[in-house]
C-alpha cells in the first residue's frame, strides 16, 4: 500500500519552495520539537537526530502519510553553527566565515506510516565563502536574511553574492537535497512522480 500524502515537518519556506519546484505540493506541518534538548557535537549525527525528532513529532498526526523532517547546520573547523540568534551574532559569524570553507550538513528523514518504515540520511555540501568587508557584512545582516538560515546565509537570496562556489548538492545548501529525496523515495518503493500534483 502506498500514500500520495507528502507532509513537510518544517516551517522553512525554502524547503517548501524546493519541493514545489519539482512538483510536490507538501502539507506543511511544522514540528514544535525543542532542539535545545539534543546535545550532539558531531554535525552529521546532530542533523539526523534533529530531523528524525521533528518528523517523529509530526508523524502521528498523519497515519497514512509520508512525513519528511529536515535539519541543517554549517560546520567550520569542526564547530557547529545553526541559525544566529540576533544581528550581532550574525555579524560575528560572517566575520568568522569570510574567506573560509565550511560544510553544510542536512539531515533528511522520511517516515512512511503506511509501510511502517523510516529512512535517515545526511547530505554534506562544501561551501566556499567570499572574503567580504565589514561594511558588506553589516549591510547583508541588515537585510534580515542571515537571521533566518542555518549558517547565516541563504544561497537562494542575497547570500548568493557572497559564496564563491559550492562543491556538492546545490539544493542541499538551500534546505534539502532533491537528488537524495528522490533516492530515498525509491528506497521506499515510490517514484517521485507519485507525488506530483
Curated annotation (Swiss-Prot):
Name of the protein: Nucleoside triphosphate pyrophosphatase
Q: Does the keyword Zinc apply?
A: no
**What organism is listed for this UniProt entry?**
Trichormus variabilis (strain ATCC 29413 / PCC 7937) (Anabaena variabilis)
Give the record's keywords alphabetically: Cytoplasm, Hydrolase, Nucleotide metabolism
Q: Which residues form the active site?
A: 71 (proton acceptor)
What does UniProt give as the signal peptide span?
Answer: none
A Gene Ontology cellular component where this protein is annotated is:
cytoplasm
The record's annotation in InterPro entries points to: ITPase-like_fam (IPR029001), Maf-like (IPR003697)
Q: Which reaction does it catalyse?
A: a ribonucleoside 5'-triphosphate + H2O = a ribonucleoside 5'-phosphate + diphosphate + H(+); a 2'-deoxyribonucleoside 5'-triphosphate + H2O = a 2'-deoxyribonucleoside 5'-phosphate + diphosphate + H(+)
Q: Which domain of life is it from?
A: Bacteria
Per its database record, what is this protein's job?
Nucleoside triphosphate pyrophosphatase. May have a dual role in cell division arrest and in preventing the incorporation of modified nucleotides into cellular nucleic acids.
Its taxonomic placement starts with: Bacteria, Bacillati, Cyanobacteriota, Cyanophyceae, Nostocales
| Location, primary (coarse class) | cytoplasm
What's this protein's family per the entry? Answer: Belongs to the Maf family.
